Amino acid sequence: MEQLSFDISRSSKSRIIASSGVFQIELLDHAGEEDFPQLIEISKHLAKEYGDHAVLTKATICRYFNKPGSLPFIARYRNEIIGYIIGIPVKDIHSEPWARLDENFGKANTLYTYAFVVLSKYKGHGYAKMLKRVYLNWAKKKDGIRFITGHVKAGISKNFT
């Protein structure tokens, strides 16, 4: 059984990857307690579409955002987190029943897009598109990753042409 480490520090550690005026995208090296409330609040918007299991907790933030090999990005507007996207190697979520259905399960070559959300009031400004593009570009450069997968709501992908 995998042992979870709850090394929770107060401060997040991140690197700014892209910015434009008051908007920026950061690659999270470590999600700290200071950002937990914003991440949890934003994740509540996923519950409307995907159910309560999509709402983040301290445990899921530590498990996925701080996991070696994961690819978590946050979007900030005027220093407030307005969205995030996180990729996790499929091999690292083997306990999820649906992960075993992935055609590349067990090959250690696939990144699963675990969650992607931008607050509604910031949609229509290109922030979600920029966040997704940065994520995809970084995912393509990750050693050993050949495929990127995930679950999306029907019709949503047409917004990312």
What are these regions (language model features)?
Residues 8-60, 67, 72-77, 81-82:
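Short amphipathic alpha-helix that is part of the acyltransferase structural core
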Residues 60-62, 71-72, 97-104:
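Short secondary-structure capping micro-motifs at structural edges
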Residues 81, 85-115:
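Conserved acyl-donor/pantetheine-binding loop and adjacent beta-alpha core of acyl/acetyltransferases
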Residues 115-118, 124-138:
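Conserved acetyl-CoA-binding loop-helix of GNAT-fold acetyltransferases
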Residues 159-161:
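Conserved active-site tyrosine of GNAT-family acetyltransferases
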